[in-house]
Amino acid sequence: MEFNGNLNAGSCSRSKKSHRQKQQQPQPQPQQHIEEIKYVGVRRRPWGRYAAEIRNPTTKERYWLGTFDTAEEAALAYDRAARSIRGLTARTNFVYSDMPRGSSVTSFVSPDESQRFISELFNPPSQLEATNSNNNNNNNLYSSTNNQNQNSIEFSYNGWPQEAECGYQSITSNAEHCDHELPPLPPSTCFGAELRIPETDSYWNVAHASIDTFAFELDGFVDQNSLGQSGTEGFNSLPSTFFYQ
């Protein structure tokens, strides 16, 4: 019985040791295949940043473009320098609309092109031209031509009618265009002004009316029935200047 107990204890200790050894062994980690895109004119520094430089084909000199945090920023800096130096013959990292096909290393569109596309999408040229034309039309002055005197009168578009629109002309300013004039107004008599009536056939000439034909003097009221048949006798034998025939 004791022999069996020792065997069981030894087997348990061995199993525990083997289990511990398995746990201590490092497990193989899956290999991560990260392929970085190789851009033209870009180099990675040991501390993790990216440097960009370009070589001038005519002078055989290298120009330092700077150090950037990402490879895309360094590649964009190289493209800008290459396009300015070499023009359409430059080898770029991104695709540009004005460059020939196959001139880029990658098939990615340049960030500069995407920004320009977005700006044109939200602000199309037709809309910008329409907006500018509306602003110019609102700021301009409008003109209206008078058909009679053919004088252009400039006015601001404020909704008020002008002289040319109403067609009104003063008599004094445009007397040569009128066939006839209105008669003059009579003078005002509010403040005691003397009213003179023109001497025409349609009015009575009071000045030439003779009062002598109606002149007579009456000393009193005389009844016609009390007159005698004789036209030469006076009333009650009193002298009078009134006679009848």
UniProtKB/Swiss-Prot annotation:
Keyword hit for Transcription: yes
Gene Ontology CC entries for this record: nucleus
One of the record's GO molecular function terms: transcription cis-regulatory region binding
Polar residues: bias regions: 1-12
DNA-binding region location: 38-95
Region (Disordered) location: 1-34, 127-148
Keywords: Activator, DNA-binding, Ethylene signaling pathway, Nucleus, Transcription, Transcription regulation
CDD domains: AP2
Subcellular location: Nucleus
Amino acid composition bias (Low complexity), ranges on this chain: 23-32, 131-148
One protein family per Pfam: AP2
A GO BP annotation: ethylene-activated signaling pathway
InterPro entries registered for this protein in UniProt: AP2/ERF-transcript_factor, AP2/ERF_dom, AP2/ERF_dom_sf, DNA-bd_dom_sf
Record-linked PANTHER family: AP2 DOMAIN CLASS TRANSCRIPTION FACTOR, ETHYLENE-RESPONSIVE TRANSCRIPTION FACTOR ERF087
Sequence similarity: Belongs to the AP2/ERF transcription factor family. ERF subfamily.
Role of this protein: Probably acts as a transcriptional activator. Binds to the GCC-box pathogenesis-related promoter element. May be involved in the regulation of gene expression by stress factors and by components of stress signal transduction pathways.
Protein name per the record: Ethylene-responsive transcription factor ERF087
